[in-house]
Each structure stands twice: as structure tokens, then as C-alpha cells.
Amino acid sequence: MAVLTSRATDFPRWYQDVLAKAELADNGPVRGTMVIRPYGYAIWERMQADVDARIKAAGAVNAYFPLFIPESYLRREAEHVEGFSPELAVVTIGGGKELEEPVVVRPTSETIIGEYLAKWTQSYRDLPLLLNQWANVVRWELRPRLFLRSSEFLWQEGHTAHVDEAEAAAYARRIALEVYRDFLTDVLAIPVFIGTKTRKERFAGATNTMTCEGMMGDGKALQMATSHELGQNFARAFDIDFLGADGAKHLAWTTSWGSSTRMVGGLIMAHGDDNGLRIPPRLAPTQVVVLPVRDDETVVAKAREIAAALTDAGLRVQVDARSGLSFGRRVTDAEIKGIPVRVEVGPRDLAAGNVTLVRRDTSVKAAVPLAEAAARVPALLDEVQAGLHAEALALRESRTADVTTVADAAAAAQTGFARIPWRLVGEEGEARLAEDALTVRCLQTPDGEIPPAGGDPDDLICLIARSY
């Protein structure tokens, strides 16, 4: 009997199987909540560490703001509260008494951080103010799916204030490119389309939203990260102003941007196969698993010796010598968990002076001299990283069609992405597509870049797809 449902047979069921068998997550007791198991959290910690370093390289610093937000804060920005109202969790009783003012459980923090940006911004010398926080947020989800849509999830959200529109726009763009696109491409090995959201799809209260859209294994789109230009909407609502170099008062220009545990779901669906996860080596909590073929003292000792050499080479290594589990069961476990390379150590191999290296992405095996194993594995990991990206890119290219009518776009988007000039779609065509559960994922320049500010929308290409 197969361990996992085949992706071709039932992709959603396969996804649930991977979550369970790879021990990534489980459903919480309240509908829409999620328990992230240790292995799933280890993957998230690796994501956090890399993204956090990129955010800090872009000049932002970490802070933390309250989970509870006065309801009146959200009402200050009308478009923002309207966009989030259906998803809000509101607390009306505290300490057994009805609260004087209801408080909202944080759905995002533009409002409460805006309150403090106003407090901390007095002069142009205080700007730019670049903040990030790692937190949980709550958005009541009617159709939950672990990692993809949950009522509570983990994320980072950045919030910045700037002296002028150009500086704010440039920073939001920098985050979209240097933090999100580069991380998704270089670490998660997921090639993403990057562009701007349409008026209908942009973040509530934003003047512009940039998005990274990945194609999953079933051809659907997943929004992986977003970066928003907020104009002066929140600055006006929260009085974020400053004394300029000219001696006059000016409103600040603000941005916000975020990525979440949804990226874990994207990792599963972009790279997973019928044997389970396939984790890119740059991300993998364990890059190499060393498997003794037999529960033999000499073989296990040699396996630990090999693991020590690989650890000394700077790799993240695990020895799986669990007694009571067959070699085949341990191989299956390593495959389901997506460990990029396994080193199989058996008595026959050792007698010949070899070990066997196995790539998780291709299942290709190679016998290598024992003395060369520690030197060979790092290069093999690089090959796995490149191979996963190449495979994901090939899938995206094979399932992305250039079309010239809305009808053809709708047909192509049943199994992948459709690219079509925006002037042939427009807001009227976008509304028609929504009737078939299709959305415009983003607008791009013809060469696939983020559209320039003030450009003619008729010159842009839009990407249409089904989405998660």
C-alpha cells in the first residue's frame, strides 16, 4: 500500500498526507488553528533566520507591538477596516467584565504601529524609520488549510516611514526584490513572477502592492510575499508628520510588507513529489542523513565518523541509527521528510572502501570512495539546489501560456498561468474571470519586471491563474 496519495490522483489529499507523514503540522482544537510540529517549525526557523538577515541588511530593525489593538484604531483608515472586517476577531470581555472599548486581535499592525510612528517621528532627521516584527496574527478563516489559510499564523511584518514618496516607493521595491524575490528564488528554489496587484486585488489602504507569485505543482498560484506602498493614507489617519528641512510640517510616506508560514505550504506544493517533501539544501534543517544499513556496531560507528566529518565541513547532519526500525523504514522516513542527500553505509560498501550517496531530488545513487565522501557531498548539495529550481522553472514555463483573449486566458488558467496584455482584460474582464474563480495575480512589464511608477497600464502584461 502506498504511503502517500499520488499527486496526480488527488493533489489536496497528497498535501494532507505529506503534512501528516512528514510530521509538519496538525489541526488545532479551534477550527482554523494550527499546531506546527517540531519538524515543521524547524523549517520555519530556517526561513526566519534567512529572511531576518535580509531584512536587517536592508536597514530595518526588529521590535514588538501588542496583540490587542483598540477597535477605534482600525476605524481611522476606512478602506483598511472595510477590507479586514469579515476576518476580524474581536474581544469584548476581559477579566469577566465587558470592556469599555472592544479590542481587535491583531490581523496586521499598520494601525497600532502607525500610532507609534507618529509618536516617534518629530523631525526629518528621525526618518527613515524602518521597523520589522515577528509575530502571530489572527484572521478568521472560513476555509482553512494548514499553512495556506489558517485563522492564526506566524509571519513577519515590516513598517516604515519616509520623508517623500520616491524614497518610500524605492524601499518597498527593494524589499520585494532583495528580501522576498531573492529569498524565494535562491533559498526556496521557487522561481516567482513579480509584479503589482490590480486595484481590486491590492492590500486594503495601499496605493500599490507588489507581489511574488509562485506556481505550485498543480499549476495553481500561491501569493508568497507582498510589499505595499501606503502613500500618505495611514500617515494622514494617524498624524505621522514631521518638521522638514524647510521648517514646515509634512506628512510622512509609509510602507508595509510581509511574509508568513504560508511559505512552508508553498515549499511543500512547489517541490514535493509522490514520495513526500523535497527540501532545497540551503533551507533544509537537516541537509544530510547518514543511514547505517545494518544495526551493526562497526557500521554504526563508521556512520557516526562520517557524520562528524560532514559536520566539520559545515553541513547540517543527522545519523539515523534508530534500533527497531528497518533500513527500508528509515529510508522512507528520510524521503518523506525531504532530506536532500542520504549517505548509506553498509558492510559491503565498507569492505569495498565505499559509501553510497543518494540524491533526494532525482533518487540517483552513486558509490564513492569513503575518503572522498566529505568532500563530495557539498557539491552534490549544490546540484540538488540547482536541480530543484530548474525543475520548478521548467514546470512553470510548460504551464504558462501567452494568449490574446479573455476566453483563452480562462482556458489556459485551468491548468497553469495565462499571460495576456492588460488592455485586453481590464477591470471588466477581471470581473468576468472572477466568476470562474480566476484572478489576475499581478501586472508586469513585458520582460517580467515590476511596472515603473506612472507607466501606462495598457503597456503591461497580466498573469491570470487559479490560486490558493
From Swiss-Prot:
Main location: cytoplasm
Keyword Protein biosynthesis: yes
Catalytic reaction list: tRNA(Pro) + L-proline + ATP = L-prolyl-tRNA(Pro) + AMP + diphosphate
MF terms in GO: ATP binding; proline-tRNA ligase activity
Location within or outside the cell: Cytoplasm
Gene3D superfamilies: Anticodon-binding domain, Bira Bifunctional Protein, Domain 2
PROSITE patterns: AA_TRNA_LIGASE_II
Stored PANTHER family: PROLINE--TRNA LIGASE, CHLOROPLASTIC_MITOCHONDRIAL (PTHR43382:SF3), PROLYL-TRNA SYNTHETASE (PTHR43382)
Record family assignment: Belongs to the class-II aminoacyl-tRNA synthetase family. ProS type 3 subfamily.
Protein name per Swiss-Prot or TrEMBL: Proline--tRNA ligase
